[in-house]
Amino acid sequence: MLENLATEERNEKTIDLDTLSPKEILAVMNEEDLTVPIAIKKVLPQIELIVSGVISCFQKGGRLIYLGAGTSGRLGVLDAAECVPTFGVSKEQVIGLIAGGEKAFVAAIEGAEDSKILGENDLKQIKLTANDFVIGIAASGRTPYVIGALDYAKSVGAKTGAISCNANAKISAHADIAVEVVTGAEILTGSTRLKAGTAQKLVLNMISTASMVGIGKVYKNLMVDVLPTNKKLEERSKRIIMEATEADYETANKFYEAAEKHVKVAIVMILTNSTKEIALEKLSEAKGFVRNTIQK
């Protein structure tokens, strides 16, 4: 029942929220938000297990699939979308599914989250395989849409994870790895878009970023597979080449163009004094890791 969930409890610090000034509201919100990273720190070992599993799936050609309803679903869609320009992956490698489909991203779809079959069908629609990793996201930890999806994922042999914001969450029993970030009562009772949503976003950031590092999408702390989809990212790409190689702007730009705007390839060309074709071959042998490529 909802009344037994910590995320549905009333926050004693904000019982009289409607009497507070804007300054006081912001102060108490900030104070409550500071508790989120502390809660996440307690479950880092579980997050690490998910990351290791995602890396393994990626190495087998599998995908990462986020799945949730409402705010939880939107956060998954957001993180999946950001992986494309940040890490240069295809939009099929990291997928975000939300109960009710794309329309639900901007408007609530009545009853969508209450259907287990809908969660199962959404995974069937993308032809889920045993090489994929499915992460169900639900602040309450009890969303039927997510539970249905996790059960189906396990039935086809896919790895599964669950992210919730309550202890002993129902969805935890339906996943291989459970991450329960206990964020407690919200300043606005039951509004899990607040601390719970913040916690979910931070955990998703960790999972996608650490997993991408694990498959060679990063050199040092640079986004070497960035997809230059606009002028800002084109300039960032050249700066990344400069940082990685200590080349000047003119040289970085020259190799950027010679590498057909592939930052990673340009870096290897400069650091190993090789042609684009040889750089691509070296990177392939090193499974895309720049550090391993240039150390050979």
UniProtKB/Swiss-Prot annotation:
What are the record keywords, sorted?
Carbohydrate metabolism, Lyase
| Pathway note | Amino-sugar metabolism; N-acetylmuramate degradation
Q: Where is the signal peptide?
A: none
Every copy of the SIS domain together lies at 54-217
Q: Where is the active site?
A: 82 (proton donor), 113
> Which superkingdom, per the lineage?
Bacteria
Question: One GO MF term, please?
Answer: ether hydrolase activity
Could you tell me the EC number(s) of this protein? 4.2.1.126
Beyond the main fields, what else does the record say? A lyase-type mechanism (elimination/hydration) is suggested for the cleavage of the lactyl ether bond of MurNAc 6-phosphate, with the formation of an alpha,beta-unsaturated aldehyde intermediate with (E)-stereochemistry, followed by the syn addition of water to give product.
The UniProt subunit note reads as follows: Homodimer.
UniProt-listed HAMAP family: MurQ
Its name, as the record gives it, is N-acetylmuramic acid 6-phosphate etherase
The scientific name of the source species is: Listeria monocytogenes serotype 4b (strain CLIP80459)
What's the name of its gene? murQ
